[in-house]
């Protein structure tokens, strides 16, 4: 599902390329953490950002996935090449593997702080890079 699912499928099928060294960082969360948070949130209420305290880069996620799939780390293309491909994708429509919106999503970091959830709920996230398993 989503971008992570597409990354796994692409690496599995040998149709995945890193972009600009895959340096963008993302906040991630193990699904098991959601289950442990529900009772805490039901009791306390409020609005919280929940994610791992460490925000892995795409390259780190690629490495974890490749290790589990016994695949080589994907080749990384320069940003300008990906941008050209994205512009073509914009013209091709929804079936294109990449377009300008997708390029922006995978090359820009998007991270959040979980400090409030940890402090107010006494919650501790599971380390994603150490515990992620492809099922």
What positions do the PLM features span?
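Substrate-positioning beta->alpha
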Residues: 2-6, 20-42, 49
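A broad, structural micro-motif
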Residues: 26-29, 56, 112
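Amphipathic alpha-helical segment in the mid-to-C-terminal domain
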Residues: 31, 58, 125-126
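Mid/C-terminal beta-alpha module of Rossmann-like enzyme folds, strongest
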Residues: 40-98, 133-135
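Active-site loop of classical SDR/Rossmann-like NAD(P)-dependent oxidoreductases
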Residues: 58, 94-114
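Amphipathic terminal alpha-helices
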Residues: 114-135
């Amino acid at each position: 599902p989503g971008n992570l699912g597409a990354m796994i499928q692409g690496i599995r099928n040998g149709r995945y390329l890193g972009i600009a060294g895959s340096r963008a960082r993302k906040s991630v969360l193990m699904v098991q953490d959601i289950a442990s948070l529900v009772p805490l949130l039901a009791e306390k209420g409020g609005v919280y950002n929940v994610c791992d305290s460490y925000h892995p880069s795409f390259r780190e996620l690629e490495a974890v996935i490749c290790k589990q799939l016994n695949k080589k780390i994907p080749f990384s293309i320069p940003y300008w090449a990906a941008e050209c491909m994205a512009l073509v994708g914009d013209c091709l429509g929804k079936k294109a593997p990449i377009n300008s919106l997708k390029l922006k999503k995978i090359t820009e970091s998007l991270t959040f702080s979980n400090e409030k959830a940890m402090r107010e709920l006494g919650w501790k996230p599971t380390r994603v890079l150490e515990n992620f398993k492809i099922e």
